[in-house]
């Protein structure tokens, strides 16, 4: 369905840029304040009826009021021209509609003015009169576009209660009004969604599920777009990413000019590693909002992960043109070049980012530049850049600069020196404000000891880490203690993991801990099954170690053909330094690339990767014996 959607979009003839219109709250010019609720109703009904109109993106009030926290609260019941105009501009409106209405002698009349906010010129005037707000609002919408969708209810009491909910000052009043709206028209979808969201925010998941289930039972009487929104809401509540994507795809087909839908769909595709589909979704978003810098940035990463590096660079250069004073475009360009193996280009871009803003990502671009040089095999050159990073941290009085030095020693192949430096740091930090860093350091030392083959030392270090652990270091300490337990069968490791991590909220950390334990025990077959499951639910950006570890287990179990694509991209270095579990994937990825190249009959490529692996491993081999095998294969 996803590809059919894009095929349909592609067949449409090119037209003018999409009009992004914000319909503001109307002003009541009539004599009765009891009619004030219609001001919001006009905005909501017209916006909803224009939602699927060709060439138009009608900006919902919920999006307009999203920036309230940054721009300050607005009196939501005030006329839109005074209270919402700046919000419309902040939401990217290229046209702003405002209006007034009055009820006299039982007849409702209204006028809508649409203007270009850049010039202040009026581009359209519309007026209508009828017996109720639905008829008048629909006529105004039809004068804006001849393709409008029917609103979700014809019940005035339901609409009035829903508008009261939208403008209520308290959660209790909002919920009461939403209940009234549902009671007045049980086939009116939006009140169900808003009420379910409030229940979920209050951690009342059962009530939220019941509301959405009730709404979906009646969804056959609702507009298709509303059904899709309800399905998406229910899928998100249940954590069903496949169903959420299906609902988003349906909604994108019904309302193809809504950038929020395309953004959510692109994010869904990214999380599912459907990168080409994410590229298409970001492009559709940019058709509506061509100056959306965040979308251009994300398009760059999506295209890079899809293997379309020229597309990635083009998107990021557009991003850079929009944000020339910022460091992030340079950092993103560095990431994309690093993914593609253009390591010197990546290094240069990271250095440019660090120069433009030394504080960006806590100074992490110098570290990334050092890693880019290291990945090229130039350890001495990488050391020079790493010293710049550490000196900058020392100048800024970073209390954990010594920790960073130890991490660099490890990742650049000085493993014994790294252990000595980090243990010295941990001992000095045990009794002061850096106690949690000491805990993490001992956990790191436990992992390093395990991969160097000293399980007894690892158990002692893990115990020290556990005794010092606090909220931010407890997870690492638990995993380190788990891994330092005596060797066992895969089934026994599973039992231990269930015992240590019994709660559903701990499933992720439990599964990763079990993977590391199985890899330490060379139990590659059960590890591959668990890694495949983890890899299926994570994007490459979320955890670059997963494809490398999965490729490792597949190579060890005779699936070299499946492993090769997983090793295509370089992992983007973290600005936070070396991962606690980096020994499981770096520099191992070069050894694995060497194995793949050897099996593919590419001896030169295999030798180059084996050499780089040996160079970055240093003189101290890890327990798996790959350094010796790489030396023998060269």
What are these regions (language model features)?
Residues 44-57, 62-176, 222:
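Catalytic-center loop of serine/cysteine hydrolases
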Residues 179, 183-184, 216-221, 249-255, ...:
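Solenoid-like repeat scaffolds
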């Amino acid at each position: 369905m996803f590809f059919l959607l894009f095929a349909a979009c592609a067949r449409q003839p090119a037209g003018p840029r999409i009009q992004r219109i914000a319909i503001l709250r109307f002003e009541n010019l009539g004599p009765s304040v009891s009619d004030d609720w219609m001001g919001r109703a006009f905005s909501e009904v017209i916006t909803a009826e224009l939602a699927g109109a060709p060439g138009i993106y009608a900006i919902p009030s919920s999006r307009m009021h999203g920036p309230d926290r940054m721009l300050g609260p607005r009196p939501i019941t005030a006329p839109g021209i005074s209270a919402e105009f700046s919000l419309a501009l902040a939401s990217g409106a290229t046209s702003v509609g405002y209006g007034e209405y009055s009820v006299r002698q039982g007849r409702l009349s209204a006028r809508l003015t649409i203007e270009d906010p850049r010039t202040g010129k009026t581009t359209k005037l519309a007026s209508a009169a009828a017996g109720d707000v639905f008829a008048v609002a629909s006529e105004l919408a039809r004068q804006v576009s001849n393709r409008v969708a029917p609103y979700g209810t014809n019940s005035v009491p339901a609409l009035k209660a829903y508008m009261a909910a939208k403008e209520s000052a308290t959660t209790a009043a909002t919920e009461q009004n939403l209940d009234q709206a549902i009671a007045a028209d049980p086939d009116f979808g939006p009140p169900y969604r808003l009420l379910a969201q409030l229940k979920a925010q209050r951690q009342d998941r059962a009530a939220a599920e019941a509301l959405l289930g009730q709404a979906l039972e009646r969804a056959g009487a609702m507009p298709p777009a509303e059904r899709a929104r309800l399905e998406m809401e229910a899928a998100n509540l249940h954590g069903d990413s496949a169903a959420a994507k299906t609902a988003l795809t349906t909604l994108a087909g019904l309302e193809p000019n809504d950038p929020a839908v395309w953004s959510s769909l692109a994010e869904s595709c990214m999380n599912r590693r459907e990168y080409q589909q994410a590229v298409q979704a970001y492009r559709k978003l940019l058709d509506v909002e061509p100056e959306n810098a965040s979308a251009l940035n994300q398009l760059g990463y999506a295209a890079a992960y899809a293997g379309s590096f020229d597309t990635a660079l083009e998107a990021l250069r557009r991003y850079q043109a929009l944000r020339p004073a910022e460091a992030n475009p340079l950092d993103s360009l560095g990431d994309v070049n690093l993914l593609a193996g253009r390591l010197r280009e990546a290094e240069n871009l990271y250095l440019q980012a660090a120069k433009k803003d030394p504080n960006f990502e806590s100074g992490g671009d110098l570290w990334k530049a050092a890693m880019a040089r290291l990945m090229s095999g130039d350890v001495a050159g990488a050391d020079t850049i790493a010293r710049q990073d550490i000196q900058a941290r020392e100048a800024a009085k970073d209390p954990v600069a010594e920790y960073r030095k130890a991490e660099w020693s490890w990742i650049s192949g000085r493993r014994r020196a790294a252990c000595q430096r980090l243990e010295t740091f941990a001992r000095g930090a045990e009794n002061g404000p850096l106690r949690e860093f000491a805990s993490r350091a001992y956990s790191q030392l436990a992992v390093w000891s395990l991969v160097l083959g000293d399980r007894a030392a690892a158990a002692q270090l893990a115990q020290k880490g556990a005794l010092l652990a606090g909220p931010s270091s407890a997870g690492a300490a638990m995993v380190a203690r788990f891994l330092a337990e005596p060797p066992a069968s895969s089934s026994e490791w599973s039992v231990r993991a269930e015992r240590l991590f019994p709660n559903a909220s701990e499933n992720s950390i439990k599964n990763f801990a079990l993977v590391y334990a199985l890899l330490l025990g060379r139990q590659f077959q059960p590890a591959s099954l668990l890694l495949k499951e983890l890899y299926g639910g994570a994007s490459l950006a979320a955890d670059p170690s997963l494809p490398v570890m999965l490729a490792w287990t597949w190579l060890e179990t005779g699936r070299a053909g499946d492993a090769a694509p997983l090793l295509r991209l370089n992992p983007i270095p973290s600005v936070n330094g070396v991962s606690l579990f980096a020994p499981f994937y770096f520099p191992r990825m070069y050894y694995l690339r060497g194995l793949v190249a050897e099996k593919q009959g590419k001896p030169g490529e295999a030798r180059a990767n084996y050499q780089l692996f040996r160079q970055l491993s240093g003189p101290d081999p890890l327990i798996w014996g790959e350094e010796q095998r790489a030396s023998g294969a060269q």
